[in-house]
Swiss-Prot record:
GO biological process, one term: iron-sulfur cluster assembly
Molecular functions (GO terms): ferric iron binding; ferrous iron binding
Protein name (record): Iron-sulfur cluster assembly protein CyaY
Gene behind this protein: cyaY
GO cellular component: cytosol
General function of this protein: Involved in iron-sulfur (Fe-S) cluster assembly. May act as a regulator of Fe-S biogenesis.
Keywords of this entry: Iron, Metal-binding
Family, as annotated: Belongs to the frataxin family.
Length: 116
């Protein structure tokens, strides 16, 4: 994967997270504060716990830090997969965010763009 392809895919993932936070805040009382600084998003929950997602450009990975631990994801096939257990990024984010928010939350992967 080229650096440009990585950047496009990673930025798409971060944008999907921001969009999901807006939707979740509109549809639930989760009240997630999401702040983006460059290639990093910090999600702060009402109990003040956080999930931090950041891009690791030299490794072409996305890293996530949650109360459950730290996780590294690499793009394989058509999704971001954990480098240790191959679990999907947005599935993990949904699980960890639900645990930290104390209610079920769903973060969806961006829809792939075809025809490029």
């Amino acid at each position: 994967m080229t650096d440009l392809e990585y950047q496009d895919l990673a930025e798409s993932a971060l944008t999907a997270i921001e969009t999901a936070c807006d939707r979740i805040n509109d549809e639930t009382d989760a009240d997630i504060d999401n702040q983006r600084t460059g290639g990093m998003i910090t999600l702060t929950f009402s109990n003040r716990s956080q999930i931090i997602i950041n891009l690791q450009k030299p490794l072409q990975e996305i890293w996530m830090a949650a109360k459950a631990g730290g996780f590294h994801y690499k793009f394989r096939g058509n999704q971001w997969l954990d480098t240790k257990d191959s679990s999907e990024f947005f599935t993990g984010l949904s699980r960890y965010a639900s645990e930290q928010a104390g209610q079920p939350l769903v973060f969806n992967a961006p829809v792939p763009v075809t025809g490029k």
